[in-house]
Amino acid sequence: MTPYVVFNGATGGLGRHLGAAMADRSLSSWPIRTRLGDSAGFAHELDQLPMERGSIATFIQSAGMVSIKECEENPAAAHDVNVGRTVATVETFIDWTLSHGITPGILFVSSGHVYAPPRTGTRLTETSTVEPRSVYAKTEVEGENQVRALAAERDVQLAICRVFGMIGPDQRHHYLLPGLITRIRNGNLANIPGLDFVRDYLDTRDVSRLLASLTAGLFTAGGKPPVTVVNVCSGQEIRIRDILDQLLDLYYTDDARALAKARGSVSAALGRPTDIPWSVGDPSLLSQLVEGPIRTVPIVDTLADALAADPA
């Protein structure tokens, strides 16, 4: 049986692509517009959806407070959003579906930030040590744990997807890519924090496609998913400096002198105390669970699309 899919975070850089990704998998899906934690509003939206008794419905919980800087500046708000309101939203979905004779499933979007810092060159697996450092990561772990306990108590299907880095067009300002583009346009390329850090980035459209594939594969049978946690990652490392270099090539494609000047002005600064110099995931389990390649959008195409989506 194919599940219905309900998801939040529809206006974010990831959520805006989820509907199309679900349609490509022939999954009926609906974005939720109610603010996170508004249980009455969420239940009212669910009342309007044409989901039949005896069906399966999966809720993709992807909304949250994800700016590491904002979480550090306001830890109480981060906890309220990423734990309190998030768990309340998941519980509302479970209560509503069970009361309507629908089998619920939860796909909880978490983060690769939850892992302990690995040795350089080590790819993080689903069994790697969880040891969050930042406020954001700590709230993600607590959210995971509370949703896991709730799902176990209600005997509900749950898959936790720990997404590593995402880049894409139309991301909000606090993400890496729009931040670098703004620096290029403002000529502000000195003292970039964490410039030599190594990360694992996928295009937001690929992440949406992978979440759709996981939803179809893990929840269609109506039984327990074969996994509880899966890393959503490419396994391919890239330095933030290399992303900046590619952006500069694209931005100054017809002006070699300006390109050389811009490159000469680039310098690195220390990252945050909680930053991890190397964070790359192991996609082995993901590869077993999804159809097709993990990456379909090359990084250079992502960068070009981001520049085109945010013209000077």
Language-model segment annotations:
Residues 47-81:
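NAD(P)H-binding glycine-rich loop region in Rossmannoid oxidoreductase-like domains
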Residues 59, 87-135:
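Conserved Rossmann-fold NAD(P)-dependent oxidoreductase catalytic core, especially the SDR/UDP-sugar
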Residues 73, 77-88, 130, 134, ...:
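Glycine-rich NAD(P)-binding loop of the Rossmann-fold in SDR/ketoreductase-type enzymes
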Residues 95, 117-120, 131-159, 185:
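Active-site Tyr-X1-5-Lys
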Residues 145-199, 204-213, 247-248:
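NAD(P)-dependent short-chain dehydrogenase/reductase
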